[in-house]
């Protein structure tokens, strides 16, 4: 799909396939009204006012057969998401009826939209920039209200405004430096230019570094904390997973080795999406299937943001327990002493002091796990500050890091006394990198790749 403004009319089903109360088939483009009218029996859609909902029936124009009773929303350019004429046909939910209407629209001249093409048109037509387009998908994929709050702020343009303002300031600085270089007749112009460049570069770097400090929190809220639940067999890992999920997703029995693979689930812990990985018990085993699960568990431990190490408080520490304590000591780890409802035999003096005694059976102290996670990753601060702008997208984070590196190169050059005109190159590069975030300077291949990750109909 070429990166140009496209004027053909596209269509797609915008609701999930399957049974439901309603289904929505969307059209966008110059001929959206004419194509919709060709299959609609009711008011003349080409003559109704913009942003109205119109009752009628979808019919097969060849046979006159009624396909469904519908409500049709008409929205005229440019006051639409794509800045093109948009029609949304609200049908009864169901695979057959929505597909039948989609095929009718295609036969009448619409083209099947590619994934993300509606949002791509909004970007190409200047309705949203790249950060706002990405925020659309973040809202769809948000697993908690906090993640949704960050995505909505980004869609509203908070990150775009910050980036655009910074780019404009960089441009102003480059222009001033250029003027000073072009008019060197003043004796102190070189000193003035160096001082200006040093002051502004440090200002830009400070701003971007402050933005990067939000990345850890933002990325966690967007993508979730990858959390490995580890422990030797039969200490209560799967029961803990089920307790956190509040539903039976892992197999729980009294037979060691029941969880023979890695089970992944998401759970909302005070607004933080935890990607819980219930690992097979880590122990030496001759069972090939279970051995594969154990190896995957070790890998999950290495790749996790957080480790929940479950020990059995009703038994003495084993060599396997000690091995797991050593294996996880460099991780963000929470030690959980399970089965405290039974007589305790575990040697507490051999454990770090920050363990949490719990009973999955009686639900004792489960809430303390949530508090400890907040302490570990958010320093007990609020998860989302209302007026703050957060970085949460890995692409944005990477580009901001590159921009900071370019600014550091300017500062290093100033310290070495390099000519100002050479330092302009790195400052210009910073301006270009920031433009990639909003899409002002993003390569065509990147734009195509980003929108291809969207769902159909969006």
UniProtKB/Swiss-Prot annotation:
Gene Ontology cellular-component terms listed: cytosol
A single BP term in Gene Ontology: tRNA methylation
Binding site residues for K(+): 234, 253, 255, 258
Gene3D superfamilies: P-loop containing nucleotide triphosphate hydrolases, Probable tRNA modification gtpase trme, domain 1, tRNA modification GTPase MnmE domain 2
SUPFAM superfamilies assigned: P-loop containing nucleoside triphosphate hydrolases, TrmE connector domain
Annotated compartments: Cytoplasm
Cofactor(s) annotated in UniProt: K(+)
Record EC number: 3.6.-.-
Residue ranges occupied by any TrmE-type G domain in the UniProt entry: 224-378
Residues annotated for (6S)-5-formyl-5,6,7,8-tetrahydrofolate binding in this entry: 26, 88, 127, 458
Binding site for GTP: 234-239, 253-259, 278-281
Keywords: Cytoplasm, GTP-binding, Hydrolase, Magnesium, Metal-binding, Nucleotide-binding, Potassium, tRNA processing
Keyword Cell membrane: no
InterPro entries referenced in this protein's UniProt entry, alphabetically: G_TrmE, GTP-bd, GTP-bd_TrmE_N, GTPase_MnmE, MnmE_dom2, MnmE_helical, P-loop_NTPase, Small_GTP-bd
Enzymatic class: hydrolase
Taxonomy, superkingdom: Bacteria
Subunit structure: Homodimer. Heterotetramer of two MnmE and two MnmG subunits.
Role played: Exhibits a very high intrinsic GTPase hydrolysis rate. Involved in the addition of a carboxymethylaminomethyl (cmnm) group at the wobble position (U34) of certain tRNAs, forming tRNA-cmnm(5)s(2)U34.
PANTHER family in the record: TRNA MODIFICATION GTPASE GTPBP3, TRNA MODIFICATION GTPASE GTPBP3, MITOCHONDRIAL
Membership in a protein family: Belongs to the TRAFAC class TrmE-Era-EngA-EngB-Septin-like GTPase superfamily. TrmE GTPase family.
Protein name: tRNA modification GTPase MnmE
Top-level taxonomy: Bacteria, Bacillati, Bacillota, Bacilli, Lactobacillales
Gene symbol of the encoding locus: mnmE
């Amino acid at each position: 799909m070429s990166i140009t403004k496209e004027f053909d009319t596209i269509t797609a089903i915008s609701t999930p396939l399957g049974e439901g109360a309603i289904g929505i088939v969307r059209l966008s483009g110059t001929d959206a009204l004419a194509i919709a009218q060709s299959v609609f029996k009711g008011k003349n859609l080409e003559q109704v006012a913009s942003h109205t909902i119109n009752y009628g029936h979808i019919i097969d124009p060849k046979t006159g057969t009624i396909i469904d009773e519908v409500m049709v929303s008409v929205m005229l350019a440019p006051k639409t998401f794509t800045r093109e004429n948009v029609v949304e046909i609200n049908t009864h939910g169901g695979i057959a009826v929505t597909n039948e209407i989609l095929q009718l629209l295609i036969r009448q001249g619409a083209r099947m939209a590619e994934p993300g093409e509606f949002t791509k048109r909004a970007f190409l037509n200047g309705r949203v920039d790249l950060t706002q387009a990405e925020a659309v998908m973040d809202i769809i994929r948000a697993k908690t209200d906090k993640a949704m709050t960050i995505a909505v702020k980004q869609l509203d343009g908070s990150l775009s405004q910050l980036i655009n303002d910074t780019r404009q300031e960089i441009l102003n600085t480059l222009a001033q430096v250029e003027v000073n270089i072009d008019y060197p007749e003043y004796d102190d112009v070189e000193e003035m230019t160096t001082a200006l460049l040093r002051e502004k570069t440090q200002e830009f770097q400070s701003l971007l570094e402050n933005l990067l400090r939000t990345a850890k929190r933002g990325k966690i809220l967007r993508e979730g904390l990858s959390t490995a639940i580890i422990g030797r067999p039969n200490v209560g890992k799967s029961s803990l997973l089920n307790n956190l999920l509040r539903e039976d997703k892992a197999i729980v029995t009294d037979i060691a080795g029941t969880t023979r693979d890695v089970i992944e689930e998401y759970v909302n812990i005070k607004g933080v999406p935890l990607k819980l990985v219930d690992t097979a018990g880590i122990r030496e085993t001759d069972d090939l299937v279970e051995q594969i699960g154990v190896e995957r568990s070790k890998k999950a431990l290495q790749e996790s943001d957080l480790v929940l190490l479950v020990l059995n408080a009703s038994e003495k520490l084993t060599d396997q327990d000690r091995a797991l304590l050593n294996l996880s000591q460099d991780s963000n780890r929470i030690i959980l002493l399970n089965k405290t409802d039974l007589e305790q035999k575990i040697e507490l003096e051999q454990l770090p002091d920050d363990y949490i005694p719990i009973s999955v059976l009686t639900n004792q102290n489960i809430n303390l796990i949530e508090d400890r996670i907040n302490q570990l990753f958010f320093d007990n601060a609020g998860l989302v500050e209302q007026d703050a702008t957060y970085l949460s997208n890995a692409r944005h984070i990477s580009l901001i890091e590159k921009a900071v590196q370019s600014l550091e190169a300017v500062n290093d050059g100033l310290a070495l006394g390099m000519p100002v005109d050479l330092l302009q190159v790195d400052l210009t590069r910073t301006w270009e990198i920031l433009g990639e975030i909003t899409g002002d300077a993003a390569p065509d291949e990147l734009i195509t790749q980003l929108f291809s990750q969207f769902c159909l109909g969006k």
